[in-house]
Amino acid sequence: VRIRFLTSTPLDIRRGSGTYVGIAVLARALRELGHEIAIETPRVRLPVYTAERLLFNRGLKPSAGFDCTVGFDMDGYRIATEAGHIAALKGVIADEVRFERGLARLTMGIQARCERLHVLRAARVIATSRYCAAQVRSLYGVAREPLVVPELIDLARWRAALAAGRAPRSAGRFLVLFVGRLYRRKRVDVLLRAAVALRGRIPELEVRIVGNGPCAAPLRQLAAELKLHGTVTFLGDVSRSQLVEEYRAASVFCLPSVQEGFGIVLLEAMAAAKPIVASRAAAIPEVVPHATLVEPDGAEALARGIESLYRSPGNCAAQSQAGAARVEQFDAPRVARLFCEAIDR
């Protein structure tokens, strides 16, 4: 089958975050099943991401010579009336924008309007979680139920990378790892305030923050104001090999986000057999029901969740085993076959 992928998300792990990972792994898994995948991305890069996305969509030509066209998120909205066009949403922009402010809120609002047109025009809609599917119907007024195909992870490659890495460097430290783009909805500020509460309760605590984004500078400033030097380390964007090392070394993975359409980082943490502390919000409980889930936006609740794992090695081990078993259902070959079934309906 010849499949055309449309995406203006940067296919670069340093810029594209989870969306990049999901599309890249899906394309590779489909190729390994024998399908031909052509990925169209912007040829012109602009300093304003929304302008870049709009320009990319304006330049899209009708599909010719393909059995199927899949547009990710808002991409493909102008040609979505073509027969068999599929809108595949990694998240729901109209849901994400609720948590943003200022220019980010304005530009994401424009993207959300395009995404709404995309799902209303497409022949089929695929979402990554039941939560995401419900938001598509609620926020975009889609009458039909979207098909749900979860995010995926290439476990063979991931585990090979973990096995080939260096020995963990924790050296007696209790390392709490966050990975993600630094948007307001990720609530890294809550993690920083939790770190203040935990310093006296976990003397060997270190919080390591991987990722960049609009909130990077304000978060660094907040960490300085909270006097978290020596407790919190901002790593910025990292290479894939360094990312693997961060997961290997981590004692606990933490995702305090209040909005996730799925959360590929949760799959990465499970693949690395790490216990997880996360917010009981959006798609997170659906993806990691075995994790330590806490009420969102509460620094003390998050601190207690992290401390509970610190004080219970047995619980950590049990959660690690549960995650390592659960992540098998998201392995790339299996999910790629589910995706094929969805586009064939």
Q: For each of these PLM feature ranges, what is it?
A:
Residues 106-125:
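Membrane-proximal helix-turn-helix segments that form the acceptor-binding/catalytic region
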Residues 131, 152:
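Carbohydrate-associated surface elements
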Residues 168-186, 192-195:
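Conserved donor-binding/catalytic core segment of Leloir-type glycosyltransferases
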Residues 220-238:
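Nucleotide-activated donor-binding/catalytic signature segment of Leloir-type glycosyltransferases, i.e.
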Residues 237-238, 245-250:
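Short alpha-helical donor nucleotide-sugar binding micro-motif in glycosyltransferases
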Residues 258:
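Aromatic "clamp/platform" in nucleotide-sugar-dependent glycosyltransferases that forms part
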Residues 275-278:
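Short hydrophobic beta-strand element within catalytic cores of glycosyltransferases
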Residues 291-300, 308-313:
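Conserved acidic donor-binding segment of nucleotide-sugar-dependent glycosyltransferases
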